[in-house]
């Protein structure tokens, strides 16, 4: 299986399976001299970590990152500094129940990659989905923590804006609320609605989808290039690679199709500091594939978790009609824990383009 690497200059290769001994990544192209601590990386991993909320999977993983190469310790014994050589990180799996999947070893679970992996490779890891599991994204979050350090002042934040039929009220958007509830909701009232909805859903053994919004601030203007190296092109590609993601939009996205040219135009004026000021941000911070200095806004839709307790019709590897009921521990809404993953992928895309721009044009 190839295609386990993303990025051009800031290149991340991930490895490992859901029920293997560990998952890891190798980061190649990270500049030397980037200082960080394991505590900083762990903070992002903890946002994604399973088993600490009744609204996510009860698989309990510590998700403690270990670094094997590419850094040296500072005198304080806590801070690490990148050396410019490949950085290898891994996270051990400690709580997988592979026996839960014995009953579906020879059956294809609807909505999963079981059938397509089998068709392509002639073999698949039935234990938790193997490489197709969302468990793979844990090391992307670790890589994203480093990516944030590359672009000076970069802030990347994410939030859940909808779960199933329930949406947040954007007039109540408050970033300070995101870390106060298990749904990463910027709307405290919506978080209560999400809680009641997911609680009822869990009783039926079903699942539901979600919409996640990522906002990147302090992105310098000029990142990205026409025509086949657009910044929004890579952001969309990186986000689309996340498990269960089925749709992407940048800025107003599909809503822009319902606007007039006058409504959609991000008009400009010269600010008092001599720099241009945009009067709106329908484009989501990117024009012609190049960042314009405004916040970059991206949204992605996450489908309902395919593993549910409701029996589903399918076939087995011999072509027989069967019914499938997936046991194991699964997220009723996998979109919730996709928030830190989306943040990481956007951070990696921006860091990659920052280095590419610096290499082509010089200092930013």
Curated annotation (Swiss-Prot):
It comes from the Bacteria. Its cofactor is FMNH2. Pfam families: Chorismate_synt. Pathway: Metabolic intermediate biosynthesis; chorismate biosynthesis; chorismate from D-erythrose 4-phosphate and phosphoenolpyruvate: step 7/7. InterPro entries: Chorismate_synth, Chorismate_synth_AroC_sf, Chorismate_synthase_CS. Its EC number is 4.2.3.5. The keyword Ribosomal protein does not apply. It is an enzyme of class 4 (lyase). Reduced FMN (FMNH(2)). Belongs to the chorismate synthase family. This reaction introduces a second double bond into the aromatic ring system. This is Chorismate synthase.
């Amino acid at each position: 299986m190839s295609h386990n690497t993303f990025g051009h200059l800031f290149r991340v290769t991930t490895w490992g399976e859901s029920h293997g001994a560990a998952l890891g990544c190798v980061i190649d192209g990270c500049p030397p001299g980037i200082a960080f601590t394991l505590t900083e990386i762990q903070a992002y991993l903890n946002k994604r970590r399973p088993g600490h909320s009744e609204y996510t999977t009860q698989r309990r993983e510590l998700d403690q990152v270990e670094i094997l190469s590419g850094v040296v310790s500072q005198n304080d014994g806590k801070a690490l500094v990148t050396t410019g050589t490949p950085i290898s990180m891994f996270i051990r799996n400690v709580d997988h129940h592979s026996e839960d999947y014995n009953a579906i070893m020879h059956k294809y679970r609807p909505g999963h990659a079981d059938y397509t992996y089998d068709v392509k490779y002639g073999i698949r890891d039935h234990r938790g989905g193997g490489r197709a599991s969302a468990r793979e994204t844990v090391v992307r979050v670790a890589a994203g923590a480093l990516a944030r350090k590359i672009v000076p002042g970069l802030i990347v934040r994410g939030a859940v804006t909808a779960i199933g039929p329930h949406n947040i009220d954007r007039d109540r958007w408050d970033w300070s609320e995101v870390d106060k509830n298990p749904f990463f909701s910027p709307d405290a009232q919506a978080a209560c609605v999400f809680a009641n909805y997911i609680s009822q859903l869990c009783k039926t053994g079903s699942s539901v989808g979600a919409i996640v919004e990522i906002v990147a601030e302090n992105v310098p203007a000029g990142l990205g290039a026409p025509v086949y190296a657009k910044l929004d092109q890579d952001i969309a590609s990186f986000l689309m690679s996340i498990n269960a993601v089925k749709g992407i939009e940048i800025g107003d996205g599909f809503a822009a199709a319902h606007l007039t040219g006058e409504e959609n135009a991000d008009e400009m004026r010269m600010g008092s500091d001599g720099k241009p000021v945009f009067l709106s941000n329908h484009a989501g911070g990117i024009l012609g594939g190049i960042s314009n200095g405004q916040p970059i806004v991206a949204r992605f839709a996450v489908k309902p978790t395919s593993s549910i307790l409701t029996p589903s019709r399918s076939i087995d590897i011999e072509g027989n009609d069967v019914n499938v009921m997936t046991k194991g521990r699964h997220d009723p809404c996998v979109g919730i824990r996709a928030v830190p993953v989306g943040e990481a992928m956007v951070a990696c895309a921006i860091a990659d383009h920052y280095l590419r721009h610096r290499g082509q044009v010089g200092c930013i």
